[in-house]
Amino acid sequence: MEGKEEDVRLGANKFSERQPIGTAAQGAADDKDYKEPPPAPLFEPGELKSWSFYRAGIAEFVATFLFLYITILTVMGVSKSTSKCATVGIQGIAWSFGGMIFALVYCTAGISGGHINPAVTFGLFLARKLSLTRALFYIIMQCLGAVCGAGVVKGFQQGLYMGNGGGANVVAPGYTKGDGLGAEIVGTFILVYTVFSATDAKRNARDSHVPILAPLPIGFAVFLVHLATIPITGTGINPARSLGAAIIYNRDHAWNDHWIFWVGPFIGAALAAIYHQVIIRAIPFKSRS
């Protein structure tokens, strides 16, 4: 980093890519002038000496802490009611997850990239948008934040927390493990593909409004996936969220199918990264000058 702090832009791409406002009307000229940024190095030792590196990790910790705190608290509020009409219901839970992602991505995008999810970090790493060093640091901080967030909820209302499943992800009765795995793969694919599309460097260079609006489609994707898959798995699509709730709840059934909420999201994230980079952007097929 050579003594300089560099904020990580949305999508964890620190390389400058913006073109002057107004170039969208130039059409094909944009494609000719635009150059792909170089991939992030696998290891970047200089990051470990930069305050911006640790600041980004702290931002991921705090964001994931707040995410788990609000969302698990919402789940507990719905679970304790005997009547669905007296609570916000599944729609309210979905809104709490999607709304928090919208708010937290907006707040942390300029600091850490606003990942708040190991699957998002993994997908961006596969696309070489950030180094392995940063990816591992983010995932550790996300998991720690999730554990702390779920722990605070349990501390507030332990009886309710332990009596209503603690917000832990499990495959619902009537569904197989394959159903749960498939729901997690597809749900995470939708989320990570939305992240790639909303933070695409080429679109950002062409359309100045894209970076500003990016948190909105990401949060909305989380909302829609939760609406669809809460009845199946409680919706993971975020290994840190699943791990934090499972550790604090710590009952056998929370761990029985826990692997699904790591394997599924990581497969979904990998497929989204491959689809965007290879099919949509065709980066491997572009001539290198």
Curated annotation (Swiss-Prot):
Residue stretches spanning the membrane: 58-78, 93-115, 136-156, 178-198, 212-232, 260-280
Keyword Zinc: no
Subcellular location(s) per record: Cell membrane
PROSITE patterns: MIP (PS00221)
Sequence motif: NPA 1, positions: 117-119
Tissue localization of expression: Highly expressed in developing tassels and at lower levels in roots, shoots, ears and embryos. Expressed in the root growing zone at 5-6 mm from the root tip. Expressed in xylem parenchyma.
Gene3D superfamilies xrefs: Glycerol uptake facilitator protein (1.20.1080.10)
Membrane topology of this protein: Multi-pass membrane protein
A single cellular component GO annotation: cytosol
Assigned keywords, A-Z: Cell membrane, Membrane, Repeat, Transmembrane, Transmembrane helix, Transport
The UniProt record lists the keyword ATP-binding: no
Region (Disordered) residue spans: 1-36
Source organism, top-level taxon: Eukaryota
Chain location of the short sequence motif NPA 2 per the record: 238-240
Any Gene Ontology biological process: protein heterotetramerization
Subunit structure as annotated in this protein's UniProt entry: Interacts with PIP2-1 to form heteromers.
NCBIfam families reported in the protein's UniProt record: MIP
Similarity comment: family membership: Belongs to the MIP/aquaporin (TC 1.A.8) family. PIP (TC 1.A.8.11) subfamily.
PANTHER family according to UniProt: AQUAPORIN OR AQUAGLYCEROPORIN RELATED
Entry note about domains: Aquaporins contain two tandem repeats each containing three membrane-spanning domains and a pore-forming loop with the signature motif Asn-Pro-Ala (NPA).
Function according to Swiss-Prot or TrEMBL: Water channel required to facilitate the transport of water across cell membrane. Active as heteromers with PIP1-1, PIP2-1, PIP2-4 or PIP2-5, but not as homomers.
UniProt-recorded name of the protein: Aquaporin PIP1-2
Organism of this sequence: Zea mays
